[in-house]
Amino acid sequence: MSAVMITRKITRKWEKLPGKNTFCCDGRVMMARQKGVFYLTLFLIVGTCSLFFAFECPYLAVHLSPAIPVFAVLLFVFVMAMLLRTSFSDPGVLPRALPEEANFIEMEIEAANGNVLAGQRPPPRIKNVQINNQIVKLKYCYTCKIFRPPRASHCSICDNCVDRFDHHCPWVGNCVGKRNYRYFYLFTLSLSLLTIYIFAFDIVHVVLRSVDSGFVNTLKETPGTVLEVLVCFFTLWSVVGLTGFHTYLISLNQTTNEDIKGSWSGKNRVQNPYSHKNIIKNCCEVLCGPTYPSVLDRRGLMLEDSCSSAPSNGATTVPVNKSSNPATQTTKSSAPLIPNEHTPDEAKPSICSGTQKSSSSPKEEKPSSPISPNAVAPAVIKESTH
């Protein structure tokens, strides 16, 4: 016969979270799996700024002002801080329903919809809530098994429901939602200023050197400047345009997802219930509102059970604690922190209880040598065969 050995290992909850995210630094850093475009963003920003600091800043600091490279460094540090803050943070992922919660929601839906005849299409799973005298529909997510809160949506790339979902941005390698939208906007705004700043002083650098060396010779002597001008020129339009678009959305207290779907415009002409009808109030709510905590317990602890079989002569070995008096010691095992829902209730106390109800009672092996009171000795439970 064989014995079943059950081992329990303490793990972090982020290791078992569903979805298509990657975690680093013991769950503190959260990103999407597709990070190739994010690395390209880092390369373009760091590479362009490095060329600017190496070639233009020394010349401009001597001929114009030493404040030029200082301001460029401060702006570069702010851009990188906002980028990493956007990329590495939880955008507002909503936890999926537990099996018990999902079953309860299913029972509520069946009770509300009644019996659906065979062949009929079931009604849509929607709840209506009222926000500022406006009816807003809460849609049911078949993946997360929850009714999504207002303005939440399911990201198909990260496979998670995100609160106040704006869009999934591959350039930052993460979703943009309730918890990192302001940092995303500050990143695009500061990156626009940095791009304009570098582009302008690249032109100034070329003009100043052309006075002494000529325009053609200057271009030959400064190939790094030419490369910076090209990168900044083609980047400027997209970054500045993106910043302007999000400035427009913030003034209306609207998300990119709502703008694409036409939630508050179009034929119905439904008013936006989240807008304060004031640009300043909308901007203050989006950019200066409170920072919401993450609802994902990423670094929480959980027990993971793993079973393995080992050859045994009709006995199962279970670790127990030995008391100071071996003669009065009963067979015990530590109770699990997280009970196994697949274990029947009548089978759970078979080892943990002090008295056994079955006919075959556990027998304890006596140690051949004296041991300390805190030592752990195996208790052998014989399996009855008929």
UniProtKB/Swiss-Prot annotation:
Belongs to the DHHC palmitoyltransferase family. ERF2/ZDHHC9 subfamily. Palmitoyltransferase that catalyzes the addition of palmitate onto various protein substrates, such as ADRB2, GSDMD, HRAS, NRAS and CGAS. It is a multi-pass membrane protein. Its EC number is 2.3.1.225. GO terms for molecular function: protein-cysteine S-palmitoyltransferase activity. Residues 306-386 are annotated as: Disordered. The active site is at 169 (s-palmitoyl cysteine intermediate). It is an enzyme of class 2 (transferase). It comes from the Eukaryota. One of its GO terms (cellular component) is endoplasmic reticulum. Residues 57-63, 205-224 are lumenal. Keywords: Acyltransferase, Endoplasmic reticulum, Golgi apparatus, Lipoprotein, Membrane, Palmitate, Transferase, Transmembrane, Transmembrane helix. The chain crosses the membrane at residues 36-56, 64-84, 184-204, 225-245. Residues 139-189 form the DHHC domain. This is Palmitoyltransferase ZDHHC9. It is found in: Endoplasmic reticulum membrane; Golgi apparatus membrane. Residues 306-334 have a biased composition (Polar residues). GO terms for biological process: peptidyl-L-cysteine S-palmitoylation; positive regulation of pyroptotic inflammatory response; protein targeting to membrane. It comes from Danio rerio (Zebrafish). The DHHC domain is required for palmitoyltransferase activity. Residues 1-35, 85-183, 246-386 are cytoplasmic.
